[in-house]
Amino acid sequence: LTAKYPNFAAQTVDADAPLSIELIGAIDKVQQVAGVPTSVPIAMTTYAEAKDLLRELVTRNLAQNMSIRYAGWMNGGMNQQLLSSVRLIRQLGTQEELFSFAQNAAIAGVPLYLDGLTAFARDSGLLEGFIAFRDAARFTTREEAEIPEYSPIWYGANDDRDTYYLVKPAIAMRSVNTLVDAAASYGAGVSFRDIGYM
């Protein structure tokens, strides 16, 4: 092959190639708290670790055409609760640390996108703000739009996982505005993980 096409195997460096990094802040894990199974956020990438990673990429000159998407940074982690307000995860750090990370990204010229779910919600109960009977969108048959988790391996409904709900459009728009306002307060952009996903 190389005899017929001598330039085929030549290595080229494309400095303009985009690099997109997704960081996961916290995941949810059910643990026993005082004998009661409770969903607890487990830190994967804290705000300070994200800032250190950004600093290292910048010092190694790898931050050109780079963007960062930070998922699981608030409201319980990756399986986020309804986005009626933004509550940072204390296991990830303080508000000042998140602001410092966002500020360092802006100084380095690296777009930072704070990720959130706005069109879907998990049945979280009265205290978290989502009640399926009241807040879930409905099919034409008046059934709640309850959606099962799908396996990325065999593309079928995964009965071992909890279901989630499509929320009413008014609630989805409120969630969008909440996420946009929160991201703007840190000087970051937004990433809508679920808009357009079905």
Where are the regions that the model predicts?
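Core subunits and conserved enzymes of cellular information-processing
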Residues: 1-19
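Active-site neighborhood of glycoside hydrolase catalytic domains
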Residues: 157-198
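Aromatic-lined carbohydrate-binding/catalytic grooves of carbohydrate-active enzymes
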Residues: 14-171
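Residues at helix C-cap/C′ positions in short coil/turn segments immediately following an alpha-helix
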Residues: 3-5, 61, 186
